[in-house]
From Swiss-Prot:
Ranges in coiled-coil conformation: none
KW Iron-sulfur (keyword) present: yes
Organism of provenance: Streptomyces globisporus
Keyword Ubl conjugation in record: no
Name of the protein: 2-amino-4-deoxychorismate dehydrogenase
Record-linked Pfam families: FMN_red (PF03358)
Cross-referenced InterPro entries: Flavoprotein-like_sf, FMN_Rdtase-like_dom, ISF_SsuE-like
Lineage: superkingdom: Bacteria
Lineage: Bacteria, Bacillati, Actinomycetota, Actinomycetes, Kitasatosporales
Catalytic activity: (2S)-2-amino-4-deoxychorismate + FMN = 3-(1-carboxyvinyloxy)anthranilate + FMNH2
Cofactor section: [4Fe-4S] cluster
Protein's gene: sgcG
One GO process term, biological-process aspect: antibiotic biosynthetic process
C-alpha cells in the first residue's frame, strides 16, 4: 500500500485571516479525499530578505542566509502537491509571499528544479481588485518550477474584506473545492503511474534547468 498523499499549502498572509480561512476550507476538502494537508504560515517563519551580496546569478550552490526558508523548501520537495495562497496587498502579491518566492526560487529551487512534476494550485484572496494579477504571478512561478497545473474551471480567487468574508463567497469557495479535488485527482493519477511503471521520471527532461547554456551563466555547460 502506498504512503498517504500530501498537499502542502504556503500561506503568504501576514495574519490569521481570510486566506487562512480559505486554506482551512481546502484542508477539509483534501482530508475528505484521504489526502494529508498541511498549511505553512509564512508569518510564523523567520525569513530574511535577500541580502546585499548580489551574487545570486554567480553562485552555483544554495543561498547561505540562515533562516527558516530551507525547512519550508524541504517540506515542498517532500509533498505531492503544493498550493500557493496569498492575499492582494497594495494591488500586488502580499510581501511575505513575494519575499518567499524570491528567496526560495533564486536561493534553492533553480539549481535542479526539485518541484518538477509536482501538482500545483493557486489561490488569491482580494477585496475586489488585482486578484487575477496575483493569481497570474503565482501561476507563472509554478510553471517556472516545472510544476503541473490542473485546470479547474474558474480561477480560485476569493473575494473578502473583513475577517470572515471569505467564507461568505460561495462561488470562490466552490472554485477552491474544485481546485483541490482536481489536484487530488492528478496526484492520484501520477502516483498510480509510478506504481504501475516503476518510473519516477514522469515528464522527464534532459536539462538540469533552463538556465544551462545561457550566456554569463554560472551553470553553463562545459565543452
Amino acid at each position: 500500500m502506498s504512503a498517504q498523499l500530501k498537499i502542502l499549502a504556503i500561506n503568504g498572509s501576514e495574519r490569521d485571516g481570510n486566506t487562512a480561512d480559505v486554506l482551512r476550507h481546502a484542508a477539509r476538502v483534501a482530508e475528505n479525499r484521504g489526502v494529508d494537508f498541511e498549511a505553512v504560515d509564512l508569518r510564523s517563519i523567520r525569513m530574511e530578505r535577500c541580502g546585499p551580496c548580489g551574487d545570486c546569478n554567480d553562485r552555483p550552490v544554495a543561498c547561505t542566509l540562515a533562516d527558516g526558508v530551507p525547512e519550508v523548501v524541504a517540506k515542498m520537495v517532500a509533498a505531492d502537491g503544493i498550493i500557493f495562497a496569498a492575499p492582494v496587498h497594495g494591488f500586488g502579491t502580499a510581501s511575505l509571499m513575494q519575499t518567499f518566492i524570491e528567496r526560495a526560487g533564486v536561493g534553492y529551487l533553480r539549481f535542479d528544479r526539485p518541484l518538477s512534476n509536482k501538482v500545483a494550485g493557486i489561490i488569491s484572496v482580494a477585496r475586489r481588485y488585482s486578484a487575477g494579477e496575483v493569481w497570474a504571478q503565482l501561476t507563472v512561478n509554478a510553471l517556472l518550477n516545472r510544476m503541473i497545473l490542473v485546470g479547474s474551471g474558474f480561477p480560485a480567487t476569493v473575494h473578502a474584506l473583513h475577517r470572515g468574508d471569505a467564507l461568505k463567497d460561495e462561488e470562490g469557495l466552490t472554485n477552491v473545492s474544485r481546485l483541490v479535488e482536481r489536484m487530488t485527482d492528478m496526484i492520484e493519477l501520477l502516483d498510480e503511474h509510478r506504481r504501475l511503471t516503476g518510473r519516477s521520471d514522469v515528464l522527464a527532461s534532459n536539462e538540469v534547468n533552463e538556465r544551462v547554456g545561457l550566456a554569463l551563466n554560472e551553470l553553463q555547460a562545459q565543452p
